[in-house]
């Protein structure tokens, strides 16, 4: 797996070598790069289905309510989002009046809400790019382990079964 940026060259490199690109980006970038990956693979004689051999990364929270989702973002993710991720991205918002929880939601990398909302969001993602692989990230040091285990269990038992995933074999 190769962490892919918005660089088309990195996607072409992954396709050329059969590497799995890992998409840490908003959906529009994933869609663009997923199509490039398929096209480049086919130029090299490897028939690929959209999403095949590709990995989408998301930071999930499956919660009891939208308010609970906002709370978890603020308590478990905000510090790392602002102070760790921020320095890596020069375009990162520097306005001190920013509504950071809303900013995190709009970033496209966090996904969540109730089970039903999570299913809808993942179905929307998979309607555009049904990725063969998913990486789910929790800031484990900030999240109570019980929350992480419960959210992963909810994802595996309620969300994942609702996704239409092609048979990539």
Regions found by a protein language model. Name each.
Residues 8, 12, 16, 31, ...:
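Amphipathic, non-transmembrane alpha-helical secondary structure
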Residues 30-131, 164-169:
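An alpha-helical appendage that flanks or caps ligand/catalytic pockets
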Residues 2-28:
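A conserved active-site cap/scaffold subdomain adjacent to cofactor or substrate pockets
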Residues 1-4, 21-24, 52-58, 132-138:
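Hydrophobic faces of well-ordered beta-strands that scaffold small-molecule active sites
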Residues 153-167:
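Alpha-helix-loop-beta-strand connector modules within alpha/beta enzyme cores
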Residues 7-9, 28-29, 61, 140-142:
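Short, solvent-exposed loop/turn segments at secondary-structure junctions
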Residues 25-27, 137-148:
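Glycine-rich, proline-tolerant flexible connector loops at the mouths of alpha/beta enzymes
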Residues 63-66, 144-154:
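Short glycine/threonine-rich loop-to-helix capping motif typified by GTGT followed
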């Amino acid at each position: 797996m190769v962490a892919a940026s918005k660089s088309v060259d990195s996607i072409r490199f992954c396709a050329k070598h059969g590497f799995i690109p890992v998409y840490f980006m908003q959906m529009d970038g994933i869609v663009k790069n997923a199509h490039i990956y398929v096209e480049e693979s086919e130029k090299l004689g490897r028939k690929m289905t959209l999403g095949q051999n590709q990995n989408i990364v998301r930071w999930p929270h499956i919660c009891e309510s939208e308010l609970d989702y906002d709370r978890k973002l603020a308590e478990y993710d905000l510090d790392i989002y602002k102070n760790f991720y921020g320095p890596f991205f020069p375009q990162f918002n520097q306005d001190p009046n920013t509504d950071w929880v809303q900013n995190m939601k709009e970033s496209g990398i966090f996904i969540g809400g109730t089970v039903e909302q999570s299913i809808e969001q993942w179905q929307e993602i998979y309607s555009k790019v049904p990725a063969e692989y998913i990486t789910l990230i929790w800031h484990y040091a900030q999240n109570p382990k019980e929350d992480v285990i419960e959210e992963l269990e909810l994802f595996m038992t309620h969300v994942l079964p609702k996704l239409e995933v092609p048979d990539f074999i």
